[in-house]
Amino acid sequence: SVWVFYRNMRPLYVLLHWLDSYQTGKKNEALNNDTQITEFRKLNDAAVRYAERTEQMFEQQKQFIGNASHEIQTPLAICRNRLEMLMDDDSLSENQLGELMKTHQTLEYITKLNKSLLLLTKIDNGQFTDTKDLELNTLLKQCLEDYKEVYDYRNIEVNITEQDRFHIVMNESLAVALLTNLLKNAFVHNMDGGRIQIIITKNSITFRNSGSGHPLDEEHIFERFYQGSKKEGSTGLGLAIADSICRLQHLNIRYYFEQEEHCFEILK
């Protein structure tokens, strides 16, 4: 009968459900799937072994990226300092100085990229455990002060509408990284004489900015290294960092295009 068939196949359905809900690098429930059928027991054992190998590979990959990024920091800093010393040499010709400046810009880009990769690794590893109650309204205004000069340089107008206070318990460094990456994004993908509107409610923060008259690819914009249109100095990791922080904090982040403006919304 159908009931007998379902009863016999139940261990398979339990295993499939466990595999479907399994997330590498996360805290997963142990497979609890007792069965007298030898083939299903072997299948259970094989699935658990495969999951364990996947976890080991995932941990090794995270450690490699983290260690590599950390070790690269010192030689990058040394190279940058030596280049700056060379650029102070009065005997350099204009062409030589120009080439050194180009090299310095490339080195600055690599340094930014390395720092972003290191931050992503720390987020993935769950290393930001020190949390406290934060009010992001005040923190956002503090972050904006750091960008006032560059916004003024491009005549970008910034307005904040505070409908309520946005409170959250999280690591302060991560909160700053989340807000600054969205502020950077609104600047980099804006235009001279453009505008940025930030709307804060009790459960959401929305960044709206003028820019190109075309919507971004919402399926890929949060992927690491994705750049719909290459912007000078952009690593392609800013939105990926924002997305990783939101997922860690159980926040939702979404993009939409409305009234010729690019909108990024953080939702509790």
Task: Please place each PLM-identified region on the residue numbering.
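Glycine-rich GHKL/ HATPase_c ATP-binding element in histidine kinases
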Residues: 260-265
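Short hydrophobic beta-strand elements within the C-terminal catalytic ATPase subdomain
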Residues: 198, 253-257
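Alpha-helix C-capping/helix-to-loop hinge sites
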Residues: 2, 50, 124, 185, ...
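DHp/HisKA dimerization helices and adjoining segments of the cytosolic kinase module
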Residues: 77-192, 197-198, 214, 220-248
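Membrane-proximal HAMP signal-relay module
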Residues: 1-68, 72, 77-88, 92-94, ...
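Short beta-strand-loop-beta element adjacent to the nucleotide/active-site pocket used for signaling
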Residues: 200-206
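Glycine-rich acidic phosphate-binding loop
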Residues: 208-215
